[in-house]
Amino acid sequence: MAYSKITLLAALAAIAYAQTQAQINELNVVLDDVKTNIADYITLSYTPNSGFSLDQMPAGIMDIAAQLVANPSDDSYTTLYSEVDFSAVEHMLTMVPWYSSRLLPELEAMDASLTTSSSAATSSSEVASSSIASSTSSSVAPSSSEVVSSSVAPSSSEVVSSSVAPSSSEVVSSSVASSSSEVASSSVAPSSSEVVSSSVASSSSEVASSSVAPSSSEVVSSSVAPSSSEVVSSSVASSSSEVASSSVAPSSSEVVSSSVASSTSEATSSSAVTSSSAVSSSTESVSSSSVSSSSAVSSSEAVSSSPVSSVVSSSAGPASSSVAPYNSTIASSSSTAQTSISTIAPYNSTTTTTPASSASSVIISTRNGTTVTETDNTLVTKETTVCDYSSTSAVPASTTGYNNSTKVSTATICSTCKEGTSTATDFSTLKTTVTVCDSACQAKKSATVVSVQSKTTGIVEQTENGAAKAVIGMGAGALAAVAAMLL
């Protein structure tokens, strides 16, 4: 059920049960808050030392709230208003911890609306009775003419001109606020009334007091509503103008009343509001309406422009660093195995190094007969295969290579190769396996390996052949003896 309908029914109930409007307002606020935030009340009732209990709710409140929740479209709950203890309602309002944050602002707004409505109604009724012009005035109009300028002005404005008509003329205006207009204060331009005199107030300003400006009448209070202020009064509309609500105030300002529009124009909700509002002496201050000078034009709500946080997830490659050789070219790269091989054209090198299976990332570089294997985060172990340079029978040959990122030049020839291993304890450098050997040395070493394999194969064959010969050497006699034993 709409809140406005609840308010209307509550007002009718107030008339029926002789309650004051202030008491009805308090009841409306409690009912609306209980219906919207029932969980808060239940939680508070179970909070120790809160002093609040659902059993101590004012009489009739829970019955009405239960009926509202069960049948929100049923108006019969208003019959329960006679059971409400209104004095207890006022006491209960101040007991809850959200009184100042939720309940009090609602009460102040409703009380302000009540004060404004009653004040404006009184003013408009007094002026309406005195504003009908005398038919014997000096102005003459043709027969059957209508009075084209009549007004309802607030008590502080003076009706300067009231057009008259002869005895046959009919006064068709002298308006009061129609009941269908949803305006906080009275006096809008009456239906079918024509105001031919100068209409004061443009679409960007509002008159804070309730008045329909007659010809030459002085608008005693004008204001420019700042943003987020509540505009509670209505103001003038000139001929054939349609009074539209929410005429002034951008964004979050709440326009309670209908306000001014110039001739045949509609005041729209997007009309600009200027600062430096001027308020005359007879402006009526209405509760939370803040019409102040040099007020901020726009009430911008804090729009959370949430920063787009981009998380860049990069699949890091191997953390190893290769020993940068001359003119190095990446021959292949595999992120799965985390291994990259770079080769600088060696002397027909056939050296192959297999990285350890426990290595987290491996870089194998073969450069000019030198094989370097580097592994991250392992104990530093340097395995070096070098040539035996003791032989001087051959003419030295020039060999250039890289040893652990350092260019190495030698002028020797290798007759034999020998392997040596040295171990150092250092976790800050990479594991490096270096083979320094020229092509002649590598070829000789390869030939030695092949030779050893050949010899091993020969021994195996000889053993097999010997075993075969031994079996055959046993001869038929041994077989005959075995056969005889079996028999």
UniProtKB/Swiss-Prot annotation:
Induction summary: Induced during anaerobic growth. Induced by cold shock.
A molecular function (GO) term: structural constituent of cell wall
GO biological process: fungal-type cell wall organization
Record InterPro entries: SRP1_TIP1, Yeast_SRP1/TIP1_CWP
Keyword Disulfide bond applies: no
Pro-sequence residue ranges: 466-487
Post-translational modification: The GPI-anchor is attached to the protein in the endoplasmic reticulum and serves to target the protein to the cell surface. There, the glucosamine-inositol phospholipid moiety is cleaved off and the GPI-modified mannoprotein is covalently attached via its lipidless GPI glycan remnant to the 1,6-beta-glucan of the outer cell wall layer.
This protein's record includes keyword Secreted: yes
Segments of this protein annotated with the region 11 X 12 AA approximate tandem repeats, Ser-rich: 137-268
Location in or out of the cell: Secreted, Cell wall; Membrane
Lipid attachment points (GPI-anchor amidated asparagine): N465
Keywords: Cell wall, Cell wall biogenesis/degradation, Glycoprotein, GPI-anchor, Lipoprotein, Membrane, Repeat, Secreted, Signal
Region (Disordered) location: 206-299
Extent of the Sequence repeats: 137-148, 149-160, 161-172, 173-184, 185-196, 197-208, 209-220, 221-232, 233-244, 245-256, 257-268
Family note: Belongs to the SRP1/TIP1 family.
Function: Component of the cell wall. Required for anaerobic growth.
Name this protein carries in UniProt: Cell wall protein TIR4
Organism the protein comes from: Saccharomyces cerevisiae (strain ATCC 204508 / S288c)
Gene: TIR4
